[in-house]
Amino acid sequence: MGNLKIYPGKLSGEVKIPPSKSMAHRAVICAALGDGVSKVTNIDYSDDIIATIEAMSSLGAKITKKEDYLEVYGINSPENIKANSVKEQRTIDCNESGSTLRFLVPIAALFDGVNRFVGRGNLGKRPLDTYYKIFDEQGIKYSYKDGILDLKTEGKLKAGEFKMEGNISSQFITGLLFTLPLLDGDSKIVITTEMESKGYIDLTLRAIKDFGVEIINNNYEEFIIKGNQIYKSIDYRVEGDYSQAAFFFCADALSSNIVLNDLKLDSLQGDKEVIDILQRMGLKLNNKDNGLIGSASLGLKSTIIDGSQCPDIIPVVSLVAALSEGTTEIINAGRLRIKECDRLAAVTSELNKLGAKIIEKEEGLIIEGVKELKGNVEVWSHKDHRIAMTMAIASTMCKERIILKDYECVSKSYPQFWDDFKNLGGVFDEWNVGE
């Protein structure tokens, strides 16, 4: 992978926020489980979304990329799922997408035969014990290899009661919420501890409802799921992504002048929390030309940030905290250690290289604000898209240019990030060792 030399300078202009990766995963899956032909518009073909498209294709959906939309011929009704099941081995390549893996493991258990899940990067280190416990209880066969993703499952999921802790990744609960309505009997998911990442569950329930499936949510303590339901085929537009918008909201908080377009103001996305966090720190938001623009003319102040409901935005809000007055504490963010990299360690290491003062804790960060970042150093993305984009926004506040190693990893979630960064006035060029 390559290196970029990125020069200081504020960003200015308008940016169309890319489609929500979280909603695109859900739309593709619901459409692929549907009873006819769906059309999904405003979709971005990031590496993770391609992984989900190809995974659902391997289960029998026919998915075609058109010029400006995705055409999805669904696997069809529960009866047709049974009729189309063939006892065979199918390989489901999740690439580096944790969402694809955890969403698809129970969905694949709708089918007879052997399912083999493979992937790359840190995906083999993502825990799947929650599913293994269910497999043990239901007699579903499985085998796996330590350290890499090579999981084989054989056996069909049965309806029933599923007890799950609320502090696990919401991806496990989402995977079951997709699958259980298609089983013969009724099911219940019982949450045994307080639910974290409620926003992601809300997104799942919204998508499922949009596609015609009903699930009763009893205050996130239990979910009641009738069996033998059918996903309807619909036309679906994916809304803008607040987890990607977070980078530009944070840039505005740090004195850039960016208008963010194509965001749904009543979105259920958990990462919309970035607005509340930045407003507590001093950001003022205004409407401009049907978009949003922020500024912090009175300065930024510290706050306490709970990472349990919005883990993906923690790297970039840590950057804002590093340049705010006072000491910010980030809590309940231990899950960041098992993302594409250990994001708590990566944020601490790379921002401290730039002159930040961050202390890493087991479940979070202590960030003492500084007045400026120095630059003239080499930082590393850790091959993590969110770390790479955080470093790009950090460069706008540095006194001197920085060199970012392994910048291409943004393709995982935001393939056109560097184009948008350049169009907003960001200045960078390729850099080779020895120059």
Curated annotation (Swiss-Prot):
Main location: cytoplasm
Binding-site residues for 3-phosphoshikimate, renumbered to this chain: 21-22, 26, 169-171, 197, 312, 339
Broad class of enzyme this protein falls into: transferase
Active site residues according to the UniProt entry: 312
Localisation per UniProt entry: Cytoplasm
GO terms for MF: 3-phosphoshikimate 1-carboxyvinyltransferase activity
Keywords linked to the UniProt accession: Amino-acid biosynthesis, Aromatic amino acid biosynthesis, Cytoplasm, Transferase
Annotated GO biological process: amino acid biosynthetic process; aromatic amino acid family biosynthetic process; chorismate biosynthetic process
GO-annotated cellular components: cytoplasm
Residues reported in the UniProt entry to bind phosphoenolpyruvate: 21, 98, 126, 171, 343, 386, 412
Enzymatic reactions: 3-phosphoshikimate + phosphoenolpyruvate = 5-O-(1-carboxyvinyl)-3-phosphoshikimate + phosphate
UniProt pathway: Metabolic intermediate biosynthesis; chorismate biosynthesis; chorismate from D-erythrose 4-phosphate and phosphoenolpyruvate: step 6/7
Enzyme Commission number(s): 2.5.1.19
Recorded family membership: Belongs to the EPSP synthase family.
Its biological purpose: Catalyzes the transfer of the enolpyruvyl moiety of phosphoenolpyruvate (PEP) to the 5-hydroxyl of shikimate-3-phosphate (S3P) to produce enolpyruvyl shikimate-3-phosphate and inorganic phosphate.
HAMAP family per record: EPSP_synth
Subunit field text: Monomer.
Protein name: 3-phosphoshikimate 1-carboxyvinyltransferase
